[in-house]
Amino acid sequence: MSQTNTLQMTNNNLKYLIAGTGGVGGSIAGFLALAGKDVTCIARGEHLAAIREYGLRLHSDLKGEQTLKIPAYTAEEYAALASSSADCKADVIFVCVKGYSVDSITELIKRAAHKDTVVI
């Protein structure tokens, strides 16, 4: 691991991208947002519309019920943003889509990642 990468990984200003904001991805996004992290969600259909209109709703025994305003985009929208601005590149990408949908987000990952991005 390079020194630059080590410094980035200890920095609290990491940008997190959650690709697939269903049960698993939504929980990860919610807990990261509650911890004050810079989180962006990738969703589609009704999930995307609900997150944009009402916010991300997190139900947790630990944190109770929370509604969080988190930026949400389609994969295509975010890929276009990331292609046009280095500021939109993610430091950490959580892939939380169903197995049969992984192929559909490879282009997003290519465009949203920089050379030191961690993909989980």
Q: Where do the model's predicted regions map?
A:
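Intrinsic-disorder/low-complexity coil detector
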Residues: 1-2, 70
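Conserved N-terminal Rossmann-fold NAD(P) cofactor-binding segment
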Residues: 38-90
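Short, structurally constrained coil/turn elements
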Residues: 10-12, 66, 113
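Rossmann-like NAD(P)(H) cofactor-binding subdomain of soluble oxidoreductases
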Residues: 68-120
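NAD(P)+-binding Rossmann beta1-loop-alpha1 motif at the extreme N-terminus of oxidoreductases
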Residues: 2-60
